[in-house]
UniProtKB/Swiss-Prot annotation:
Ligand binding (ATP): G38, E39, N40, G41, A42, G43, K44, S45
SUPFAM superfamilies: P-loop containing nucleoside triphosphate hydrolases
Lineage: Bacteria, Pseudomonadati, Pseudomonadota, Betaproteobacteria, Burkholderiales
Organism (species): Burkholderia ambifaria (strain ATCC BAA-244 / DSM 16087 / CCUG 44356 / LMG 19182 / AMMD) (Burkholderia cepacia (strain AMMD))
EC annotation from Swiss-Prot or TrEMBL: 7.5.2.10
The protein's name: Xylose import ATP-binding protein XylG
Length: 519
């Protein structure tokens, strides 16, 4: 067996006396891919910040050995010089700069006199991408011209340009399509063959199974186990992550589906940059009380734009005829939708869901502050009581309600956004990618909440790129493709293949509106 490239022993990191890491061990060998698994808030990101130099030597206890010698890093530059490079979930690219300029950002090649040697950066960038078998990227184009999948590949090229010996991938496929994820996994396998080691952090355990040789599980800041992937099952990893077995991820129970509550007809959204192009083209559908309506389709199909238009949040021009309980609605802004009884948890939690500077509690009550106001003054005691009730109901884990929401894990941020929308007491709740970047324990809690709301008569619209999630939750499934409605299926024996087949099959024109008659 080869000698370890990296050894972390007994890593302890505390914040205000509270241990975020408590004696964590991690070993990585050359050419090995180690899966790092744990619930949100388990300490994965904190451990990687210790390793990558974000938390410099001296701010934590324990030992890190790199290539057999102690690693003493005062910052990220030191670890990158050693060959440790992290690719964060939120990509660190400058959209306006070219691909080549991004690949060499901070490591620019200069000519005598200090001018950048752009031609040489282009040549080397092309060679890097060629080496990765990536031929669909023009390195002279701005990064903004490429989608999330290509940008992830650009980040990998940027890391290899820094001569990475250990690549840390933090939720690398969270915004990728299935095809883009396959390309990513192929590249990870290729890097392993070249001797590059990887730490692969992901809640998608099928990806961990596909590329990882070893899995290290941490829970509540402590090391639980390190075992070869060949000896593990997905259920075993989940049990180690959450400390219990999750026997039924989708706890479906019979629930009554009532009359139509929301009807949307002829929804059309024009592209923000190119108004002649339609992102959503004449889509009509209805949802009933107590119904869980799944919305599936390929990435970029127009699902999010469709939901934004209904909620009054689409940034471009849109038209729609919306009726609530049979009455026409004029929705020009999210505030109109919330007043009418429609709430939405957005896809991009960080950009559209939370106010990072505010505390957890104030994020929860943000949409309903009027409820706690008397003569222009907020009743702080009543507000705090509501905050604590919602935090307890949704198991939002935070030391106190005034903790900045940005310091919480993704799963707890998502539950806080859900709490805010539930405080509005909606008749219709739109959930756009509700479990993206959320660990399996938090997923199970969100699924239980969805079924509980359906039993109470709330109409739920769940947009998801995870087809098992759609099939596990939905009573009925809409399929969107290239802005069109391409299928409306009752979820009775429905398969992933049927959904994908509908997504890839152009709709007959004109689109037939969905009937709103009662069953």
């Amino acid at each position: 067996m080869t000698e370890p490239l990296l050894t972390m022993r007994g890593i302890v990191k505390a914040f205000d006396g509270v241990k975020a890491l408590d004696g964590i061990d991690l070993t990585v060998r050359p050419g090995e891919c180690v899966g790092l698994c744990g619930e949100n808030g388990a300490g994965k990101s904190t451990l990687m910040k210790v390793l990558s130099g974000v938390y410099p030597h001296g701010t934590w206890d324990g030992e890190i050995r790199w290539e057999g010698a102690p690693l003493v890093a005062s910052g990220v530059r030191d670890t990158e010089r050693a060959g440790i490079v992290i690719i964060h979930q939120e990509l660190m690219l400058v959209p306006e700069l070219s691909v080549a300029e991004n690949i060499f950002l901070g490591n620019e090649i200069t000519l005598p006199g200090g001018r950048m040697h752009y031609a040489e950066m282009v040549r080397r960038s092309e060679a890097l991408l060629r080496d990765l078998r990536i031929d669909a990227i023009n390195v002279a184009q701005p990064v903004m011209n490429y989608g999330g999948g290509h940008q992830q590949l650009i980040e990998i090229a940027k890391a290899l340009n820094k001569r990475a010996k250990l690549l840390i991938l933090d939720e690398p496929s969270s915004s990728l399509s299935a095809a883009e994820t396959r390309i990513l996994l192929d590249i990870v396998r290729d890097l392993k063959r070249r001797g590059v080691a990887c730490v692969y952090i992901s809640h998608k355990l099928d990806e961990v199974d596909a590329v990882c040789d070893t899995v290290t599980v941490i829970r509540d800041g402590r090391h639980v186990a390190t075992e070869p992937m060949s000896t593990l099952t997905t259920d075993r990893i989940i049990a180690m992550m959450v400390g219990r077995e999750i026997r039924n991820l989708y706890p479906r129970e019979p629930h009554e589906i009532g009359d139509v509550v929301l009807e949307a007809r002829n929804v059309t959204c024009h592209d923000v940059a190119n108004p002649r192009r339609k992102r959503v083209d004449d889509v009509s559908f209805a949802v009933r009380r107590g119904e869980i309506l799944g919305v599936a389709g390929l990435v970029g199909a127009g699902r999010t734009e469709l939901m934004q238009a209904i909620f009054g949040a689409y940034p471009g021009a849109s038209t729609a005829s919306i009726r609530m309980n049979g009455r026409p609605l004029a929705i020009r802004a999210p505030a109109d939708a919330i007043r009418a009884g429609i709430a939405m948890v957005p896809e991009d939690r960080k950009r559209h869901g939370i106010v990072p500077q505010l505390g957890v509690g104030h994020n929860i009550t943000l949409s309903v502050l009027r409820r706690f106001a008397t003569r222009g003054r907020i009743d702080a005691a009543a507000e705090l009581d509501a905050i604590r009730t919602e935090m307890q109901r949704l198991s939002v884990r935070a030391a106190h309600p005034f903790l900045p929401i940005a310091s919480l894990s993704g799963g707890n941020q998502q539950k806080a956004v859900l709490a805010r929308m539930l405080l509005a007491d909606p008749q219709v709740l739109i959930l756009d990618e509700p479990t993206r970047g959320v660990d399996v324990g938090a997923k199970a809690e969100i699924y239980r909440l969805i079924f509980a709301l359906a039993k109470r008569g709330v109409a739920l619209i769940v947009v998801s790129s995870e087809l098992p999630e759609v099939l596990g939750l939905a009573d009925r499934v809409l399929v969107i493709g290239e802005g069109e409605l391409r299928g409306d299926f009752v979820n009775d024996g429905l398969t992933q293949e049927q959904i994908l087949g509908a997504a890839l099959t152009p709709a007959r024109r004109p689109a037939e509106p969905i009937a709103a008659s009662n069953p």
